[in-house]
Design a protein with these regions (language model features):
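Active-site hotspot residues in diverse enzymes, especially metal/ion-binding acidic/histidine motifs
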Residues: 1-224
């Protein structure tokens, strides 16, 4: 059985889920996706916060399977704790206001693991969302896990759930008269367009970097040869 879906397939599934969510909760899909509400009221998953004590500080989110323990700080000790199945556990530091973008994306990533396990009719298993740290040395096994197909799929679906095309197009209309953002060469964006992206990101509730990646993925970055 294949355990791979293309970007187009992931986009289509995400669009279908968001459409079903919007039909059920018509006041929830306006300028951004209330990902916490989507998770708890539509997917019917729980969200909890804990102080992670894993060796890998990049592990900031976890989808519990009811069997795999998560190392957490509790009462001055580090203990293995098993959370109930279908619980998304986030590191407590993500509650800070400045971490809103990372918090929302981590929720979407873990929710995507749940959705994908249902699509593949596979039993759910405990999965971490780990952020890549360019200053850290990773083992081959850690790198393989981080960039595994299932993680790419969860990242791709998470971005699609959090930033549906319709939401981005609405923000682009509001802040850039529906014009695509121009990129010169491979990565150069003017200060003016960077400011537009920052306003769009704040409006949607995501990070600048996540939005740039999403704009590129859905072909709303226009490549120009020179300024």
């Amino acid at each position: 059985m294949s355990i791979y879906m293309s970007r187009a397939e992931l986009e289509e599934i995400s669009e279908g889920l968001i459409t079903a969510y919007a039909n059920k909760f018509s006041n929830r899909v306006i300028q951004s996706i209330d990902i916490e509400h989507f998770i708890t009221e539509f997917l019917m998953l729980r969200i909890e916060y804990a102080s992670f004590a894993e060796d890998d500080a990049g592990r900031i989110g976890f989808l519990a399977d009811g069997a795999t323990p998560l190392l957490v700080h509790q009462d001055g000790k580090i203990i293995p704790f098993v959370f109930p199945k279908d619980t998304i556990v986030l590191d407590k530091f993500l509650l800070a206001e400045k971490e809103q973008g990372r918090r929302r994306f981590t929720m979407a990533h873990e929710a995507s693991h749940h959705i994908l396990s249902k699509m593949y009719a596979m039993p759910s298993e405990g999965r971490f969302h780990a952020e890549y740290d360019s200053e850290r040395s990773y083992s081959k096994e850690e790198l393989a896990q981080m960039f595994a197909s299932v993680e790419w799929q969860a990242d791709t679906m998470g971005a699609s759930l959090l930033m549906p095309r319709r939401i981005i197009e609405n923000a682009l209309a509001k802040y850039n008269q529906s014009n695509p953002i121009r990129v010169y060469g491979d990565n150069t964006i003017t200060s003016k367009d960077k400011a537009v992206i920052r306003r769009m990101a704040a409006y949607i509730g995501v990070s600048y970097t996540a939005l740039v990646i999403r704009l590129r993925d859905i072909c709303l970055l226009y490549t120009s040869p020179s300024p």
